[in-house]
């Protein structure tokens, strides 16, 4: 643990629970100053943690907050929601909600924060994607939003690579978070990967921490899977 005053500033969405909380907690232990964005009350306490209440599904709110975060050295977009449904019974409103939280929020935040990183010639962006981006029955709308994050990350990575800014996606398989027990996904339960257990949020946090480090300066535009061997089954 770094006992010195944190120098780097990370913005983490979805920081009150699940993967986002694990990432924020890991970064705090590593000596970062963290701003956590979430619509629910913060669950972390640290002198180096600042909670910002925000509904990432409301674009105007995200835009207003993003303008206050241009000093961020890293952005981790971990906020997410899952709604399931097969073709013929798709819920348009559920699809729109997932698009706003996953894709629109990422676009709004990056539209403000990424240019500032490029101007400083230093920065890291990580989106939390999903292996489901490759497609899965009953989760087409969710998959589309996560696939969009991969397309955005590769496009933006190409735009800012020469300014020493990296943009990557970390795509977990089923993870041990509250989302696994969400009643909204009861029609499509999580499947255990070959390792026989769910991915732990702390495992994802450590991978994200590496991508934010100087050692990962040459990794950009990548979709990195942490799947417990699930990809071996295809």
Q: What is each stretch, according to the model?
A:
Residues 16-17:
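Conserved glycine-rich cofactor-binding loop
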Residues 81, 88-108, 122, 126, ...:
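Catalytic Tyr-X3-Lys loop
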Residues 82-96, 138-141, 179-183:
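Conserved mid-core segment of classical short-chain dehydrogenase/reductases
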Residues 110, 145, 153:
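Active-site helix of classical SDR
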Residues 115, 158-159, 217:
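Alpha-helical segment proximal to the catalytic Tyr-Lys
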Residues 161, 166, 219-221:
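Short, small/polar-rich loop/turn modules that mediate ligand/substrate recognition or access, typified
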Residues 193-204, 215:
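A conserved structural motif in NAD(P)-dependent oxidoreductases
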Residues 220-234:
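Short C-terminal tail/terminal secondary-structure segment
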